[in-house]
From Swiss-Prot:
A biological process from GO: transposition
Residues that coordinate or bind Zn(2+): C416, C419, C433, C435
Entry's Gene Ontology molecular function annotations: DNA binding; metal ion binding
Superkingdom, natural source: Viruses
Name of the protein in its database record: Putative transposase R186
Organism name: Acanthamoeba polyphaga mimivirus (APMV)
Amino acid sequence: MVYNQDLSISNKTCGISDWLPPVRNKKISDIKSNSWFDIRRCLNPNIKTKFVPVNNKQIVLKEPNCIYLKYDLITLNPSSDHIRILREWFSLYAKIYNYAINLIRKMFYVNNKLIKSRLQCEIYDEIIIRKLSNDKTKLIESLKLSDRPPEFLLDYAISHACTYCNSQVKKYLKDSKNPYNKKTLRFRLWSLHKSRRVMHILPPKLCDKNVCNGLFLKLNPSKNIHDIYMFCVMSWDRLTGKFFVYKPVLKRLINIPKKQFTRCGIDPGVRTFLTLYSSERTYDVCDSTFYNNKIKRMWRKIDRINFLLHNRKKRKKRKNDRRLRKSLAKYYRKIRQRIKDLHTKTAKYLVSRYKEIYIGIYDTSKNLSDPRISFYEKRRIATLNHELFLTKLQQVADRFGSSVFAINEHMTTKTCSKCGRINEIGSSKVHKCACGMYAGRDENAAKNILKKGIKEHYLSAQSDKNVTEYNNKKSNNTNKET
């Protein structure tokens, strides 16, 4: 018998009940999320939760301290001549961005080998702008337009590339501390055939009459863009032909939702997107049935369109090729929007109910590179995108006064949450142990993540506090004796 020492703590010391929902005769109630997925809840019959009226669900702050950033969408309505100019600007922005990325790559890699001594150095915009000054002038002169882009717009592209590379280096240094993590440092280039393109702009500079003959003053925005004094993002969708500006707005948080419960543990997965456990109840978010009904159908349509576009014996351009590519982009966009809706609504639902959230780290890149996992399973992992959900959850938690802790979920599925024994369960949905514990696989893992989080962040801090108090008392007694 092998026991897990990290999880061999009793439930009583962690302040958790021994309850786990039964596998058979499980009383489940569906919670409507006003979206394409549902949340399934199972209540603990031993604990009676108090009914909270609607008026008491929010706390009104007298002095709001939390300030967060939000983006307002502004649509642009340019004429046909202006559309042609803006398209050239977007392609030029992408080219100079790729030039900067290639130059930064050469700084870190020599003969395809990473020089680790240069990782501590920060990449500065001014140095790379100086080095790419000749390339900038050549690219601007190559355009046949009368309204050529200003040089500072291309400088924004270089600074955009520098910030991206600095973030990638910081992420690599953080991940390299973990001995099990074998990720490489990558600086990705932008594809010039992307359906959606992005450009960083500063509206006060571009809205000047002397810049490009006052081009930005003639774009007919849906809202005023002259009062923006921060960097904002301008995007262009090639397939729909629409232009947008994302205006940053600072907002103060006035109401904070009251937290009904204290702690919970979350096990991210593929069959069910999230499985949550707390002493009072459990939640199952987005079961496989909802995924199959809503998203799997779209993937089938995407596969069919790709087959029509690429797998032909004699490839000839047809009239309906453009229509097929438009429909392909439409289905990709629908999947992206549905996953975004899933992430935002579940994050808000969890943060409004729990003070402390312990969530397991689901390594997407590791699972995608595993040869044992099938292609369709990998596709499902990539679409659900647990890493993106974790960042979204942390952002929403900072806004609403909750704390999120990312926990390593190593051996949490195999370990029994009652006795700490390690059992080989394989691919079964039920965890059965010799101690008499018979529960669902995901609920057991979520409970272990909760126990692990309490041990790491709560019990260890409490034990350190007790040790310091004991040492202080001991030193005081020795001083009195002397």
